[in-house]
């Protein structure tokens, strides 16, 4: 069993349902879980109570739940007489649910870097002309990744240079998807609303610009907003560079974005 989406049954509930659907009585069984079973009423009932009611005899867990609101499941299981073993394979479990741990402990999106480079570390020719480095299989994998991120409500992030030089669509095109990722551009210069960019023409409602406070208050930003494009202010951080922690916080907490796929250039 696995947790398919927020608000859906957790992995433990899915596992119990799968066993019963196959005619297997879980009573007296051992259940191995990556994360401590939750112990609170949120979008779903507590998994700890479901395991107790199912008659599970032993639970082997990998990690304690970092969310204090959901923690406490292990103690509840022990109180009910269930044998609890763990933590086990902690690093492997951390790697398996690295995105979830980032959401819970840092309240930001999980950031993925997409990078194609030559063996000597180059990403373009000497005169900065575009040169294909990746093969067809790599291109297909990028579209798979975009499709998955889009399905979850995630975003692709690029800089203004990539936006202006490549005029990208930032969509999943070679694989079926029910939802395209958001297109986020971090730039010092907003485009004119009438400029012929794919994102402005075809996907204005999915396009978000992150700019300085002054640019965010400009007439260009207002005109883009009338087209459905969103423009947000991101102030300077360390050494005058964009404040990425603030950007990530905005994406996660205000826009609900769980993943960011970074596809920008060298800068």
What do these predicted regions represent?
Residues 1-92, 182, 213:
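Zn2+-dependent cytidine deaminase-like catalytic core
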Residues 262:
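Gly/Thr-rich phosphate-binding loop signature of adenosyl cofactor/nucleotide-binding cores
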Residues 12, 43-47, 70, 138, ...:
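Amphipathic coiled-coil/heptad-repeat helices and related helical stalk/stem segments
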Residues 10, 41-42, 68-72, 95, ...:
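Residues that form or flank phosphate/diphosphate-binding pockets in enzymes
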Residues 191, 266-267:
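Short Gly/Pro-enriched loop/turn and capping motifs at secondary-structure junctions
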Residues 102, 108, 112-258:
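Active-site ligand-binding patch in enzyme domains
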Residues 64, 161, 265:
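Flexible loop residues that form catalytic
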Residues 74, 88-116:
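Proteins enriched for Cys/Gly/acidic motifs involved in redox and nucleic-acid/cofactor modification
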């Amino acid at each position: 069993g696995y947790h398919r989406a927020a608000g859906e049954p957790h992995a433990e509930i899915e596992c119990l349902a799968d066993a019963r659907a196959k005619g297997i009585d879980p009573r007296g069984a051992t259940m191995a879980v990556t994360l401590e079973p939750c112990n609170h009423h949120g979008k779903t009932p507590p998994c700890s109570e479901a395991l107790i009611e199912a008659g599970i005899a032993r639970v082997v867990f990998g990690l304690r739940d970092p969310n204090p609101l959901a923690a406490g499941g292990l103690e509840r299981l022990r109180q009910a007489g269930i044998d609890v073993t763990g933590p086990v394979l902690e690093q492997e479990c951390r790697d398996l649910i690295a995105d979830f741990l980032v959401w819970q402990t840092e309240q930001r999106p999980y950031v993925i870097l997409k990078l194609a480079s030559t063996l000597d570390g180059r990403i373009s020719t000497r005169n900065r002309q575009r040169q294909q480095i990746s093969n067809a299989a790599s291109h297909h994998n990028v579209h798979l990744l975009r499709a998955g991120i889009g399905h979850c409500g995630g975003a692709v992030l690029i800089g203004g240079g990539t936006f202006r030089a490549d005029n990208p669509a930032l969509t999943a095109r070679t694989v079926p998807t029910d939802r395209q990722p958001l297109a986020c551009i971090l730039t010092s210069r907003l485009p004119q609303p009438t400029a012929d960019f794919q994102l402005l023409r075809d996907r204005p409602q999915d396009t978000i610009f992150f700019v300085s406070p002054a640019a965010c208050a400009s007439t260009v930003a207002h005109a883009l907003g009338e087209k459905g494009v969103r423009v947000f202010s991101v102030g300077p951080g360390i050494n005058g560079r964009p404040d990425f922690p603030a950007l990530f916080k905005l994406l996660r907490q205000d826009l609900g974005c769980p993943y960011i796929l970074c596809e920008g250039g060298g800068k």
